[in-house]
Amino acid sequence: MEKYENLGLVGEGSYGMVMKCRNKDSGRIVAIKKFLESDDDKMVKKIAMREIKLLKQLRHENLVNLLEVCKKKKRWYLVFEFVDHTILDDLKLFPNGLDYQVVQKYLFQIINGIGFCHSHNIIHRDIKPENILVSQSGVVKLCDFGFARTLAAPGEVYTDYVATRWYRAPELLVGDVKYGKAVDIWAIGCLVIEMLMGQPLFPGESDIDQLHHIMTCLGNLIPRHQELFYKNPVFAGVRLPEVKDAEAEPLESRYPKLPEAVISLAKKCLHIDPDKRPFCADLLRHDFFQMDGFAERFSQELQLKIEKDARNNSLPKKSQNRKKEKDDALGEERKTLVVQDTNADPKIKDSKVFKVKGSKIDVEKMEKGSRASNANCLHDNGTNHKGLASTSLRDCSNVNIDHSRNPGTAIPPLTHNLSAVAPGINAGMGTIPGVQNYRVDEKTKKYCNPFVKPNQPPPAGIYNMNVSTSVSGEKYLLQANKKRKEYPKADVRLPELNYNHLPELRALEGIARNSRLIKKENKCLSESRIPSLAAIDLHVSSVASHQGAGSPLSDDSEADLPRMEHQH
C-alpha cells in the first residue's frame, strides 16, 4: 500500500472506511476500502472475503471495478476505481426528484448491472441510492457487494442478512430464508419512485412499520408470508393489519402526476408475490424504455460514455502532463486567487502578487456542485469544479501537499451555508439550487469604503447622527494628517523675534502673545527640526516684565541666539 498517497476520507461505516488515494507511479485516482482488523472480527472477515470473491468474477461496465486486493497487518484493503458521486447525492441536491430523462438513463444501467449479477446467480441484496455510483460521464456503477452472495442451493437457507429497511422486500421483513433474485427487483421498484419524487416510497421506522407502509399501498401479504410473520418470534404478540381493497392507496392514486409507464413498471417490480415479479430482461423490454426508441438510442450513447471514462482513467505517468490536463478540465471555476500586497513600496511599479490555489478537498466539493448543475444532461460535458461545499478539517488532515510546487500561502477552506444563500429555491425535477458566487462577495468586500457617505442619507436618528459625526470626524483627521505629512519643510515659518521690546508693552499682553507663540510652535515641532526660540523669547519677556518697562536685553542673551535673516 506504500505506492498509494492518501488524499482524504470519503466515508466510513460499520466494517471499515473508504479513502481517496493516488497511485504515486501512474497518478491514477482510486478508492481504497480499508476493513477493520478481520482476524479479530469474524463478521468483518466474512464480508471482506465475500466481496473479494464476487467482484473478482464480476466484470461489467455497470459494476464498480475491483483493481487490486492486499492484506496488511490483519487488515484487508480493496482498491477500486474512484467514483465519488452517487444517486443519493443527486437526491439531496434535487429534493423534489430528478428529471424524467435522467431517471430513464440511470434506471436502464441499474437494471443492466443487476441483470448481469443475476445471470451469474448472484444477488446484491443491498440496492439503494448510496450504493449506486455515477461517473463524470454519467455511467452508473453498482458498488458495495459486502452483502451480496450466490443463490442458495436447494434446501440451503440464507442467514446474517442486514440491509436498509426502506428497500427490503416483504419476504425479507417476515424472515423468509428462501428468497431469491426478486428481492433486487423489489428494490428497483422502490428506487424508481424515489428518484422521480425525491422521497422514499416506504420510509418505515421499524420492520412492523415497514410492513404497514407496504400493505396500505399494495394490499395484504400472501398467505405464506402471513404464516411466517406469526411464526417469527420477533413479531410475537403483534397482529398484521387487515387492509381491504377499498382502504388501500395504490401507486396511481398516491402519485397521480407520474406517467402511466412509470406506474406500470413500478407495480410490476413491487408485486406483493415475489414469484410474480419480472426478471431484469423483462424490465428492459418495458414501455418505459422502449417508447420513442430510447433503449436502442441510449445503448449507443452509453458506449461512448464508457469509452470516455476509460480514456479518463488511463492517465499519463508524467505529473506535469497530468496537472495540465486537470487544470484544463477545471476551466474558469478553478482560477487562481490573486491577492495584491497593498503595503508594497510605492516606488515599485508593479504590486506584489501572491497566487493561492484552493485545497484538493475544496476542488472535489466544487466538482460535486458543478456536476449537479449538469444533471439534466447526465454529465455529458464532464465536470467543472465548484460549489460548495463545506470541508471538515479532518478531511484535510491526511492530505499530502507538495510545498515545493505550491509555495504560496495556504488559505483555509470556508464553510458556506447554501440554504442561507437561496432559501426559497424549489429544486424540483431538473432544477438546480442556487450556488453562491464567491467572486461577487470578494468584489463587494474589496471596494467597500466605510468613509464614503451614501448618496441618500439614512433617516434622522440618534444612532445615525452619531455614526455620521464619527465618520466625518475621522475623515477630517485623515485629511489633516495627510496635509501635515505633505507639508513641505521649506514652507515652515518660525515665529518672528522682536529684538526691540518697547517700554510701553504691557506685561500681560506680552505673556499672552508669547503663549500663543508657544502653542503655534508646539504644533510645528513634529514637522520641523529647526530649534525653537519661543521658550527663550518667553524667558526674556518674563524678565522684562519683572524688571520694568524699557529694560534692554543683555549682550550675553543676544550672543546665545542664532543669527536670523529678516524679510521685509
From Swiss-Prot:
Q: Where is this region: Disordered?
A: 309-333, 545-568
Q: Where is this motif: [NKR]KIAxRE?
A: 45-51
The EC class name is: transferase
Instruction: Name it.
Output: Cyclin-dependent kinase-like 2
Its localization reads: Cytoplasm; Nucleus
The Protein kinase domain covers: 4-289
Where is composition skewed (Basic and acidic residues) in this entry? 322-333
Q: Which SUPFAM superfamilies match?
A: Protein kinase-like (PK-like)
**Family membership noted in the UniProt record:** Belongs to the protein kinase superfamily. CMGC Ser/Thr protein kinase family. CDC2/CDKX subfamily.
User: In the Enzyme Commission scheme, what number(s) does this protein have?
Assistant: 2.7.11.22
Ribosomal protein among keywords? no
Domain commentary: The [NKR]KIAxRE motif seems to be a cyclin-binding region.
